[in-house]
Every structure is written in C-alpha cells, then in structure tokens.
UniProtKB/Swiss-Prot annotation:
It holds the Pfam family Bet_v_1. One of its GO terms (biological process) is defense response. This is Pathogenesis-related protein B. One of its GO terms (molecular function) is protein phosphatase inhibitor activity. InterPro entries: Bet_v_I/MLP (IPR000916), Bet_v_I_allergen (IPR024949), Plant_def-hormone_signal (IPR050279), START-like_dom_sf (IPR023393). It comes from Petroselinum crispum (Parsley). Keywords: Pathogenesis-related protein, Plant defense. Belongs to the BetVI family. GO terms for cellular component: cytoplasm; nucleus.
Amino acid sequence: MGVQKSEVEATSSVSAEKLFKGLCLDIDTLLPRVLPGAIKSSETLEGDGGVGTVKLVHLGDASPFKTMKQKVDAIDKATFTYSYSIIDGDILLGFIESINNHFTAVPNADGGCTVKSTIIFNTKGDAVVPEENIKFANDQNLTIFKAVEAYLIAN
C-alpha cells in the first residue's frame, strides 16, 4: 500500500472551540446550508455520532463525485481534534484504499485559532495519487473552512 500525505492550515478570528464545533461536530447539518452545492445530505448508517460512527454522504452537484462513506476515527473535544476516514465511494477513484482526514483547531493568543488539516491517501499497491487530486482535496478543505467560518462570524 502506498501512502501520500498533504497538509494545509489557515487562521481564523473565530475561537478554536466554536470553529471545532462548526467544522467537525455540527458539519452534517451546517454544510448543506452553507455550501449546498458541495453536500446534499449525510445519513448515519451506524453509531451515534461518536467514534466508530459510519456515515453515507451524498455529495452535491458542484462535486465531481456522488457519494462517500466516512467512518469517525477520533474525537477529542479537549484538544479540538477530529479524525475520520473515507472508506468507500467514487471519491476513492478505484485506486485509493482509504483517505484519512485529521483536523485540529489550535487556539491563538488573540482568541482566534489556526486550523490544521492533514490528509493521508492510502493507495492500492504502488498507485500514486496525481498532484491535481491532492490539490483538489486541499482546496475543498479550505473552501469548507472559509464557508463555515463566514457562517460562524455572521451568526
């Protein structure tokens, strides 16, 4: 299995606690409202929202993909850390085994925070994820971050 890793970070005037809640804990209900073209809906297949929960996400018309199945790997409300894996769906392109996503909101001295996102692509065999796909994933994470941040500032 091949492994490729990508990291991106962004700063916000929103507190780490509030941004963590919006980006991670409330994302299933918030994202279809703030970016309706990105995600249509999310349905829980197993679990209660905590670690081990499996969700089927129906992506929106703005996405080149239709669905993805996610599994919640870790939630740490004390350190504002959230991890999930994409374990199925056309987003895996047939040559990716899974995609691990890790988000952390780190409090800043000014009351805002820095959001750090790490994406790990686990490929089948020695397949390589093209750079444009990695860039697309990073851009999607930043787009989601900016949309949720704007919503939280306005509300």
